[in-house]
Amino acid sequence: MKVLESLSNQHKTGLIPDFAWVKDGTVTPAKKDQVAGANDGNYGANSCRLPWRLANSNDKAANQVLSKMMNFFLEESTITEGYTLAGKPLSSNKSENFSAPILYAAKKKEAYGNLVDSQSWVIQNGLSEDDYYGDTLTTLVTLQMNQK
């Protein structure tokens, strides 16, 4: 959790990169193409699951990391497919990969009701059938949201 806290504290957005390095107690985002591709050091296809994962934790530090990210997303008029850690959109496209985890986290806390409204399109539109990753995240999130 300390690594996530450190990464969250490095930017006012609280966004976490897809990959990071820990060396001698220092945490730094990976650079482009160091691990898997051009978005290694951005909030991308790997880190987009974090809101969903952190929302399932009762840990105080996890909730602080999540709150910082969610506050960033509250300010965005549209949640797009990836961001730099400073909050610059990497695309103008919406994506289930990014919206489904945010929807789940927003459902867990009343303060994020606007995100529930804006991200509900993920469920209302149904599965795309051509986006395995997005459809999988949407299905998992929907199942968990409906648990009693």
Language model regions located:
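Extended ligand-binding clefts on enzyme/binding-domain cores
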Residues: 1-100, 107-110, 132
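Terminal, non-catalytic domain-edge segments
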Residues: 53, 105-121, 125-148
